[in-house]
């Protein structure tokens, strides 16, 4: 039971981390495009929903993989 809680907590941390990194990257990319290409800043909702889906799936898989490797005591984790 303790191992399952560990995996779920690790998945949540990975999801949140990827969401924060992805949001910062997306905002910096919009600012870069505004200053260097003179493209208008367009913060569209479908971009954020796509970013949320990517962070949930990617962070979930990453957290699950790291958690399982740690539970099975694979070297390096």
UniProtKB/Swiss-Prot annotation:
It is found in: Membrane. Its main location: membrane. The keyword Transmembrane applies. One of its GO terms (cellular component) is membrane. The keyword Transferase does not apply. Keywords: Membrane, Transmembrane, Transmembrane helix. It is a multi-pass membrane protein. The chain crosses the membrane at residues 8-28, 54-74. Probably interacts with cognate toxin CdiA. Immunity protein component of a toxin-immunity protein module, which functions as a cellular contact-dependent growth inhibition (CDI) system. CDI modules allow bacteria to communicate with and inhibit the growth of closely related neighboring bacteria in a contact-dependent fashion. Protects cells against the CDI activity of CdiA, its cognate toxin protein, but not against non-cognate CdiA from E.coli strains 563, EC93 or D.dadantii strain 3937. This is Immunity protein CdiI. It comes from Yersinia pestis.
């Amino acid at each position: 039971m303790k191992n399952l809680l560990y995996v779920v907590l690790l998945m949540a941390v990975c999801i949140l981390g990827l969401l924060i990194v992805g949001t910062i990257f997306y905002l910096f990319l919009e600012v870069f495009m505004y200053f260097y290409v003179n493209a208008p800043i367009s913060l569209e909702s479908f971009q954020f929903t796509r970013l949320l889906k990517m962070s949930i799936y990617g962070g979930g898989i990453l957290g699950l993989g790291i958690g399982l490797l740690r539970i099975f005591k694979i070297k390096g984790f």
